[in-house]
Amino acid sequence: MNRIDKTLEKLKANRKKMLSPYITAGDPYPELTVSLMHQLVKSGADVLELGIPFSDPMAEGPVIQRAMERALAHSIHCDDVLNMVRQFRKTDTETPVILMGYLNPIEQYGYDLFAQQAVEAGVDGTILVDLPPEEADGVSRVWQKHGLYSIYLCSPTTSAERMNYINQHANGYLYYVSLKGVTGSDALKLPELKAQYLQRKAQSKLPLMVGFGIKTPEMAAQVAEFADGVIVGAALINEIIEAYEAKKDPLQASGALLSSMRQAIDNIGSMV
């Protein structure tokens, strides 16, 4: 069984919500990434999302764009990201790792070789932001051959027809984009988000995890009251880079934010 499914089953059995942090591989410097991954697990992460740096990250706001620029300045590419996962797997064989990014670097790498190398390194799935599910058949077949999960995006504007298609092809869970815009956006309106989320939830055969715009423990808990889980990216990267630039400890800063989110989410009580 894929580590993602094992984790989701465990969360359901324990009546807990998923917490998934996102970091960009190689940001702020390559040697920190594996230690950050371990720190985030220690601080309550259920699933790790590791970003593959890309020069044109169209879905990202300025925080993650700058993170990718810093990583690319260190010449971080697919092989480097896979090596980071290999290092992580030496001491953590249970926490799911999802690679999140864009199609171009993987296409250049070669789909079959990438999937083979990713699974060998210990990757459990991918989120390819610019690959619509209707155009993903070729990639999906290769991923299935190697046992790599495809995590798809859905949003308030996703049609019922597209949700039906996603239901036929997705694995693990869906990444629910909470609002129109880019990562790190400010305009999260909870009543509207809840209503739209519940519409998509009713159409989905898989758990829906909410990302985009979740910045504080309070906001994470409010979303987790109705959602299957939350994903935090830009807020976490802000903590990491601010600590690094202030010559403080990025591990402590990122761990403190994630721990507070974990506690806030767990304090909402039983799953609804």
Swiss-Prot record:
UniProt xrefs under Gene3D superfamilies: Aldolase class I
Alphabetical list of InterPro entries matching this protein: Aldolase_TIM, RibuloseP-bd_barrel, Trp_synthase_alpha_AS, Trp_synthase_suA
Record's keyword terms, sorted: Amino-acid biosynthesis, Aromatic amino acid biosynthesis, Lyase, Tryptophan biosynthesis
Reactions it catalyzes: (1S,2R)-1-C-(indol-3-yl)glycerol 3-phosphate + L-serine = D-glyceraldehyde 3-phosphate + L-tryptophan + H2O
GO molecular function: tryptophan synthase activity
Cited function: The alpha subunit is responsible for the aldol cleavage of indoleglycerol phosphate to indole and glyceraldehyde 3-phosphate.
Full protein name: Tryptophan synthase alpha chain
